[in-house]
From Swiss-Prot:
InterPro entries: SVWC_dom. This is Venom peptide Pc. GO terms for cellular component: extracellular region. It comes from Pandinus cavimanus. Residues 1-20 form the signal peptide. It is found in: Secreted. Expressed by the venom gland. Disulfide bonds: none annotated. SMART domains: SVWC (SM01318). Keywords: Disulfide bond, Secreted, Signal, Toxin.
Amino acid sequence: MSHLRIAVIFLCTLFALTAGAEESCQVGGLTIPVGKTQQDRCTLYECTMESNRVVLKSMICAEQSLRRGCKRVPAQATAPFPDCCPTTLCRGRQWDRPRTL
């Protein structure tokens, strides 16, 4: 059992050192260089360097509570972020989808 702990600690340390040395972030099957952003489905990832640490930031669509007289309108899931996020349309303001010119 102690050999397993040592192996896990070694792998975690190796991963931490490798991530900083290559200056990139790993998420899912993506490799994102420091200073770059990349999208995967409706999530936007940004790999940054902060205080000599490689940091992965992710942005997703926020949950919104619906008020009376409003409805949630789904967006196209393959659209770039944040256009893939659903919108809320309210009666009296913008009940219908905005018209494109």
